[in-house]
Amino acid sequence: MTDIEKMISGLIYDPADKELAEMRQAAHILSKKYNDLYENDDDRNKILDKLVPNRGTNVYLQGPIQFDYGCFTEIGDNSYANFNLTCLDCAPVKIGKNVFMGPNVSLLTPVHPLHVQSGKTQDEDIDKHK
């Protein structure tokens, strides 16, 4: 099982996995580019096409936005997010149709180990990538 499969299944995974790290960095770069554009700039939709490819029509994200991956998020038609949408989509996030989100909404899927031994293993994995 790959670390991506583990992650989206809610299992312990290596967040420093090369493929995951590259995907996360790409999403962070696209989020930054989106945030740097004026809201009437047509390039915002081109960025969202790459960042959140699983979205319906007439989706508007006010910005600023922040996604961990973007590709694990689905947004239904006619949905709107006000300022400061944060979506840590380490597991699938599904936003339905006709959803209106206020400012400062955070959709957070990461789960950190609660058992000491599990935490030690993950800490050791993180330390080796410093």
Task: Describe these PLM feature segments.
Residues 65-75, 80-130:
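Flexible, glycine/small-residue-enriched loop-and-beta-strand segment within the central core
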Residues 1-58, 114:
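Terminal amphipathic alpha-helical/low-complexity segments used for targeting or macromolecular assembly
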